[in-house]
């Protein structure tokens, strides 16, 4: 009995030691990307100076607001893809309206009369 417990522990330890070595060749590390808006903003900032339309001598407040709005715009989920996924997952928003018209023909079937309150067939047969 003592020998079997020792073998079980050794087997468990050997399995645990193999598991981390198998996990190492996983996915490559992710490199942080810069959003497309920031790549465009950096060359403009390097150009120096203000835009021709800026009338304020500081001009920092408007620039900060633009940067914030650009970041928020980049963080938003693409609405077109979101709508496509919603359409795919939910058959049709008014599907109940269409299903109701099709069920009227079922009440004349061979399996009995439709029970309106429950929404199932009575099971009376032909």
Swiss-Prot record:
Q: Which SMART domains match?
A: NAT_PEP (SM00183)
Q: Which molecular function GO terms apply here?
A: hormone activity; signaling receptor binding
| Compositional bias segments (type: Gly residues) | 46-62
Task: State the UniProt keywords alphabetically.
Answer: Cleavage on pair of basic residues, Disulfide bond, Hormone, Osteogenesis, Secreted, Signal, Vasoactive
Q: Which domain of life is it from?
A: Eukaryota
Q: Where is the composition biased (Pro residues)?
A: 26-35
**Record's GO cellular component, any one?**
extracellular region
Read off the PANTHER family from this record. C-TYPE NATRIURETIC PEPTIDE
Tell me the protein's name.
C-type natriuretic peptide
Q: Which organism is it from?
A: Ovis aries
Q: What is the lineage of its organism?
A: Eukaryota, Metazoa, Chordata, Craniata, Vertebrata
